[in-house]
Amino acid sequence: MWLQHLSLKTFRNYKETKIDFNPKLNVFLGRNAQGKTNMLEAIYFLALTRSHRTRTDKNLIHFDEEQLHLSGLVQKKTGSIPLEIELTQKGRVTKVNHLKQARLSDYVGHMNVVLFAPEDLQLIKGAPSIRRKFIDMELGQIKPIYLSDLTNYNHILKQRNTYLKSDQKIDETFLSVLDDQLVDYGCRVMNHRLDFIKKLESFGRKKHFELSNQIEELSISYQSSVNITDKQNLSESFKIALEKSRSRDLFKKNTGVGPHRDDISFYINGMDASFGSQGQHRSLVLSIKLAEIELMESITTESPILLLDDVMSELDNTRQLKLLETISQSIQTFITTTSLDHLQNLPENLSIFTIQDGKAAVNGN
């Protein structure tokens, strides 16, 4: 798939911009704070209805406006698909083929993206919430039912936590009803995640072995607050975990076990990767990103769109060449950079957009 056209209206520092893209390589060139990353963020937001840079949607709206509008035309093997997002103070409206979508899971997945940014190193050494978000964003694109199950789980979780925080006497029977619902959706979420991690590890191990000159083996482990060793009895394991945690939950007035507490760990040759070098972290994250591309292709039969936010200058020649190998294949890529000097051996079929003060000019014109 590839993004043919993007229209931004009052998004970040863009007042109104319309831009047609190259199906292969697109480079956003400009000084810092001109809007290069904002352009990538707009593409990411159009795909996922979420920003990778802020949790506060109003930060995306131009400072002197009250709403924003994004639209794009995605080309796929099955034809073209118009996508739209309108964001106001009241919330967001999403459209596919000009038809309003009722649920997030009905919208996400029509355009798949893989983002690689400097802050992705936090995937290895950052907080567990960063890794859970990573799973949610990537898995949600290739398996829309996951977003539906996750939304339902979070809804029940919020109900349970609100009830635990209430001043009224706790009704154990009602709490058990909530627990049953939490177990139902929680097991669905965990099963989706376990399947995703297994596939990601398979693709990632091969990529990392190549990147490390056949000396490092990558493995990924899903760390759960629930016993996940026996998937056939996952529901029973979750129930037992909730029962054991009940006195703790009543005291702390929140839910201490479940997929909202889970994490993933990365290992290099059996050792915790978080203790590795900066170079190992870069290689590992690059391996994961390249694995994501292959994983998405294997499931959707479409190549995702690759977004590279000022990462080429962070990579040595070996890693750059590996990334450029991927770019030279049939995958649309967007790169931000302050200088073309950072980009070596680029494919010939590319478009360069000069970004300045929230405006984009193709080939500097």
Curated annotation (Swiss-Prot):
<keyword id="KW-0227">DNA damage</keyword>
<dbReference type="InterPro" id="IPR042174">
    <property type="entry name" value="RecF_2"/>
</dbReference>
<dbReference type="InterPro" id="IPR018078">
    <property type="entry name" value="DNA-binding_RecF_CS"/>
</dbReference>
<keyword id="KW-0963">Cytoplasm</keyword>
<keyword id="KW-0067">ATP-binding</keyword>
<keyword id="KW-0238">DNA-binding</keyword>
<comment type="function">
    <text>The RecF protein is involved in DNA metabolism; it is required for DNA replication and normal SOS inducibility. RecF binds preferentially to single-stranded, linear DNA. It also seems to bind ATP.</text>
</comment>
<keyword id="KW-0742">SOS response</keyword>
<comment type="similarity">
    <text>Belongs to the RecF family.</text>
</comment>
<dbReference type="GO" id="GO:0009432">
    <property type="term" value="P:SOS response"/>
</dbReference>
<dbReference type="GO" id="GO:0006260">
    <property type="term" value="P:DNA replication"/>
</dbReference>
<dbReference type="GO" id="GO:0005737">
    <property type="term" value="C:cytoplasm"/>
</dbReference>
<dbReference type="InterPro" id="IPR003395">
    <property type="entry name" value="RecF/RecN/SMC_N"/>
</dbReference>
<dbReference type="InterPro" id="IPR027417">
    <property type="entry name" value="P-loop_NTPase"/>
</dbReference>
<keyword id="KW-0234">DNA repair</keyword>
<protein>
    <recommendedName>
        <fullName>DNA replication and repair protein RecF</fullName>
    </recommendedName>
</protein>
<dbReference type="GO" id="GO:0003697">
    <property type="term" value="F:single-stranded DNA binding"/>
</dbReference>
<dbReference type="GO" id="GO:0006302">
    <property type="term" value="P:double-strand break repair"/>
</dbReference>
<dbReference type="GO" id="GO:0000731">
    <property type="term" value="P:DNA synthesis involved in DNA repair"/>
</dbReference>
<feature type="binding site">
    <location>
        <begin position="30"/>
        <end position="37"/>
    </location>
    <ligand>
        <name>ATP</name>
    </ligand>
</feature>
<dbReference type="InterPro" id="IPR001238">
    <property type="entry name" value="DNA-binding_RecF"/>
</dbReference>
<dbReference type="Pfam" id="PF02463">
    <property type="entry name" value="SMC_N"/>
</dbReference>
<dbReference type="GO" id="GO:0005524">
    <property type="term" value="F:ATP binding"/>
</dbReference>
<keyword id="KW-0235">DNA replication</keyword>
<keyword id="KW-0547">Nucleotide-binding</keyword>
